[in-house]
């Protein structure tokens, strides 16, 4: 029994390590942490002024301008993929090896030996061929559309915003989780304080579900282990 476990356990561990689901880290990019935050210019308003500086100046747009301000992100992501591969190989090999039973000498003796060799020639011939043909194709279309409110976490020294937001929904026992982070330019924010996801640099978008539907569509771990270690 111990010998069986000794041979089986390594394959089981390998299978478990090879069946880990893809993960995405929502940690900010390194440069976001390295860049110093933009220094705010706090200018005191003149006494009695009607147009003093504040969080919402009179003639400013109602857009995110400061840390902790909200920005609505319109997520419109679609991917289209189509691949096709063909491979064909062929190899033929023929080998001949032969030799006379008698060799050497010259003149009359050589002629006599050649006649003997013509009737007593020994040798062998091999023929081998190998053919392989493979064809594969794949097509995939996916789209994901939703909106999510994010918060300005940091204003970088160049004026760009690092935003982050999440949303969780629980509907009939099925939990939906949406997380988003990335870097945006304030100039790309629309007049209605929204921005399209295509303008987000280093965007990380996570969407996952937890519940009965997710468990029913997930492969059992035993099947994943067998598929990972099965060599054929």
Swiss-Prot record:
InterPro entries in UniProt: Flag_Lring (IPR000527)
Topological relation to the membrane, as annotated: Lipid-anchor
Metal-binding keyword on record: no
Lipid modification (S-diacylglycerol cysteine), residues: 16
Compartment(s) where it occurs, according to its Swiss-Prot or TrEMBL record: Cell outer membrane; Bacterial flagellum basal body
Leader sequence segment: 1-15
Keyword Ribonucleoprotein belongs to the record: no
Coiled coil spans: none
Entry's Gene Ontology molecular function annotations: cytoskeletal motor activity
GO cellular component, one term: cell outer membrane
Keywords: Bacterial flagellum, Cell outer membrane, Lipoprotein, Membrane, Palmitate, Signal
Annotated lipid attachment (N-palmitoyl cysteine): 16
Pfam families membership: FlgH
GO BP: any one term: bacterial-type flagellum-dependent cell motility
Job description of the protein: Assembles around the rod to form the L-ring and probably protects the motor/basal body from shearing forces during rotation.
The family this protein is said to belong to: Belongs to the FlgH family.
NCBIfam families (alphabetical): PRK00249.1-3
Subunit field text: The basal body constitutes a major portion of the flagellar organelle and consists of four rings (L,P,S, and M) mounted on a central rod.
Protein's name according to its UniProt entry: Flagellar L-ring protein
Organism for this UniProt entry: Campylobacter jejuni subsp. jejuni serotype O:2 (strain ATCC 700819 / NCTC 11168)
């Amino acid at each position: 029994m111990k010998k069986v476990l000794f041979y089986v356990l390594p394959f089981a561990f390998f299978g478990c390590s090879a069946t880990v689901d893809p993960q995405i880290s929502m940690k900010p990019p390194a440069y976001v942490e390295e860049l110093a935050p933009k220094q705010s210019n706090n200018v005191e308003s003149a006494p009695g002024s009607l147009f003093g500086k504040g969080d919402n100046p009179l003639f400013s747009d109602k857009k995110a301008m400061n840390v902790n301000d909200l920005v609505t992100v319109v997520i419109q992501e679609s991917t289209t993929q189509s691949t096709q591969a063909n491979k064909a190989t062929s190899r033929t090999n023929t080998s001949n090896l032969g030799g006379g039973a008698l060799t050497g000498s010259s003149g009359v003796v050589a002629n006599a030996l050649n006649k003997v060799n013509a009737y007593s020639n020994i040798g062998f011939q091999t023929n081998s061929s190998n053919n392989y043909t493979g064809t594969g194709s794949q097509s995939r279309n996916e789209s994901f559309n939703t909106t999510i409110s994010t918060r300005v976490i940091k204003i970088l020294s160049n004026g760009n915003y690092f935003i982050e937001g999440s949303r969780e929904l629980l509907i009939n026992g099925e939990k939906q989780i949406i997380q988003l982070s990335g870097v945006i330019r304030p100039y790309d924010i629309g007049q209605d304080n929204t921005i399209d996801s295509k303008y987000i640099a280093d965007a990380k978008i996570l969407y996952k579900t937890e519940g009965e539907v997710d468990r029913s569509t997930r492969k059992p771990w035993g099947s994943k282990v067998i598929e990972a270690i099965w060599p054929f």
